[in-house]
Amino acid sequence: MKHTVEVMISEQEVQERIRELGKQITERYQGSEDLVMVGLLRGSFVFMADLARAIELTHQVDFMTASSYGNTMESSRDVRILKDLDDDIKGKDVLIVEDIIDTGNTLNKIREILSLREPKSIAICTLLDKPSRREVEVPVDYVGFAIPDEFVVGVGIDYAQKYRDLPFIGKVVPQE
């Protein structure tokens, strides 16, 4: 598909919001010695790296990979866990870090899986949220930006494995 990418949220806006989220998360977990950031790969890795630096607490990082997209622009209901956590989260404060919440299906499944492992708490932080697309209600504690139902890329979010490196959030605009 031929397309262009238009800036939707600037690099400066993204970085300012990540710093704000870092402050909020730091306040919430002040005194916790067991905060584990769980990044959902691949899309969250850029956001997670920036957020990890913005959180002024000692914390661990771990990653999971789940897939519901493939190389299309549409989310499917089929959620597959491709990589699980390396470490045990029992008794720990878990912060799931997501790039974008669309239908909520993937995140809901991951939240269910992690809940069975008996963490002390589970919170969710996402860079982008598309509330109009939600099929499953998932409690989201920290939202960078609520956006309309547009296909977006940048700050780790891809289209067919491209554009993850963009420092801004861009809207993919199909060309005829």
UniProtKB/Swiss-Prot annotation:
<dbReference type="InterPro" id="IPR005904">
    <property type="entry name" value="Hxn_phspho_trans"/>
</dbReference>
<dbReference type="InterPro" id="IPR000836">
    <property type="entry name" value="PRibTrfase_dom"/>
</dbReference>
<feature type="binding site">
    <location>
        <begin position="102"/>
        <end position="107"/>
    </location>
    <ligand>
        <name>IMP</name>
    </ligand>
</feature>
<feature type="binding site">
    <location>
        <position position="98"/>
    </location>
    <ligand>
        <name>IMP</name>
    </ligand>
</feature>
<feature type="binding site">
    <location>
        <position position="99"/>
    </location>
    <ligand>
        <name>Mg(2+)</name>
    </ligand>
</feature>
<dbReference type="GO" id="GO:0000166">
    <property type="term" value="F:nucleotide binding"/>
</dbReference>
<dbReference type="InterPro" id="IPR050408">
    <property type="entry name" value="HGPRT"/>
</dbReference>
<dbReference type="GO" id="GO:0004422">
    <property type="term" value="F:hypoxanthine phosphoribosyltransferase activity"/>
</dbReference>
<dbReference type="InterPro" id="IPR029057">
    <property type="entry name" value="PRTase-like"/>
</dbReference>
<feature type="active site" description="Proton acceptor">
    <location>
        <position position="102"/>
    </location>
</feature>
<keyword id="KW-0808">Transferase</keyword>
<keyword id="KW-0328">Glycosyltransferase</keyword>
<comment type="function">
    <text>Purine salvage pathway enzyme which catalyzes the transfer of the ribosyl-5-phosphate group from 5-phospho-alpha-D-ribose 1-diphosphate (PRPP) to the N9 position of hypoxanthine to yield IMP (inosine 5'-monophosphate). To a lesser extent, can also act on guanine leading to GMP, but shows a highly less efficient activity with xanthine.</text>
</comment>
<feature type="binding site">
    <location>
        <position position="98"/>
    </location>
    <ligand>
        <name>GMP</name>
    </ligand>
</feature>
<feature type="binding site">
    <location>
        <begin position="102"/>
        <end position="107"/>
    </location>
    <ligand>
        <name>GMP</name>
    </ligand>
</feature>
<comment type="similarity">
    <text>Belongs to the purine/pyrimidine phosphoribosyltransferase family.</text>
</comment>
<feature type="binding site">
    <location>
        <position position="158"/>
    </location>
    <ligand>
        <name>GMP</name>
    </ligand>
</feature>
<feature type="binding site">
    <location>
        <position position="43"/>
    </location>
    <ligand>
        <name>diphosphate</name>
    </ligand>
</feature>
<feature type="binding site">
    <location>
        <position position="42"/>
    </location>
    <ligand>
        <name>diphosphate</name>
    </ligand>
</feature>
<dbReference type="GO" id="GO:0032263">
    <property type="term" value="P:GMP salvage"/>
</dbReference>
<dbReference type="Pfam" id="PF00156">
    <property type="entry name" value="Pribosyltran"/>
</dbReference>
<keyword id="KW-0963">Cytoplasm</keyword>
<protein>
    <recommendedName>
        <fullName>Hypoxanthine phosphoribosyltransferase</fullName>
        <ecNumber>2.4.2.8</ecNumber>
    </recommendedName>
</protein>
<dbReference type="GO" id="GO:0052657">
    <property type="term" value="F:guanine phosphoribosyltransferase activity"/>
</dbReference>
<dbReference type="GO" id="GO:0000287">
    <property type="term" value="F:magnesium ion binding"/>
</dbReference>
<feature type="binding site">
    <location>
        <position position="164"/>
    </location>
    <ligand>
        <name>diphosphate</name>
    </ligand>
</feature>
<comment type="subunit">
    <text>Homotetramer.</text>
</comment>
<keyword id="KW-0660">Purine salvage</keyword>
<dbReference type="GO" id="GO:0006166">
    <property type="term" value="P:purine ribonucleoside salvage"/>
</dbReference>
<feature type="binding site">
    <location>
        <position position="130"/>
    </location>
    <ligand>
        <name>GMP</name>
    </ligand>
</feature>
<keyword id="KW-0479">Metal-binding</keyword>
<dbReference type="GO" id="GO:0005829">
    <property type="term" value="C:cytosol"/>
</dbReference>
<keyword id="KW-0547">Nucleotide-binding</keyword>
<dbReference type="GO" id="GO:0006178">
    <property type="term" value="P:guanine salvage"/>
</dbReference>
<dbReference type="GO" id="GO:0046100">
    <property type="term" value="P:hypoxanthine metabolic process"/>
</dbReference>
<dbReference type="GO" id="GO:0032264">
    <property type="term" value="P:IMP salvage"/>
</dbReference>
<comment type="pathway">
    <text>Purine metabolism; IMP biosynthesis via salvage pathway; IMP from hypoxanthine: step 1/1.</text>
</comment>
<keyword id="KW-0460">Magnesium</keyword>
<feature type="binding site">
    <location>
        <position position="98"/>
    </location>
    <ligand>
        <name>Mg(2+)</name>
    </ligand>
</feature>
<feature type="binding site">
    <location>
        <position position="130"/>
    </location>
    <ligand>
        <name>IMP</name>
    </ligand>
</feature>
